Amino acid sequence: MEDGLAIGRTAIAIFGLLAFASLPAMTPGQEPDVAIRAGEHRIPFTVRDCAVYVHARVNGNRAILLLDTGAVLTTLSLKLVPTQQTDSRITVTMAKGSIVAFRVPVGFTLGESSEREEHYSFRQPAIVGDFKFGSADGVIGLDVLSSFESVTFDFKNAVIVLKSK
């Protein structure tokens, strides 16, 4: 009987080792979803009224910007970026009429964290005019978003993941 018990225990141990050995190994590319990879910036966002907003700085001023994948150009309000005299005057035709606007180089920082991976700074021309954005100060459009290799909205963790090209 003891021989049968020893064989049974040995068989269980062997099956356990085989089961453990057959588990897939975790490779370096399989870090948890919240791990920050090189070239990634994880910018916190909030959702209000089915829209995604990020805290930002525009020319050093605090701002709340709407992320709009349907907007071709990044557009800002005059109260956020008062324009200086510029020759880049344009007319923007909208559903409710036309607005005089200007194409102006602007300094942006998306995200307010001091952590390098949790904000992203860049310069980009933007359209500045007497636009109304509800509770936002401006819109980040595809001209900015398409400058990244990928843009992922992680709603579970409330971050937008910007992967540099």
Regions found by a protein language model. Give the residues of each.
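Short hydrophobic transmembrane-like helices used for membrane targeting/insertion
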Residues: 7, 12-14
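N-terminal secretory signal peptides that target proteins for export/translocation
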Residues: 1-7
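Pepsin/retropepsin-fold aspartyl endopeptidases
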Residues: 2, 15-165
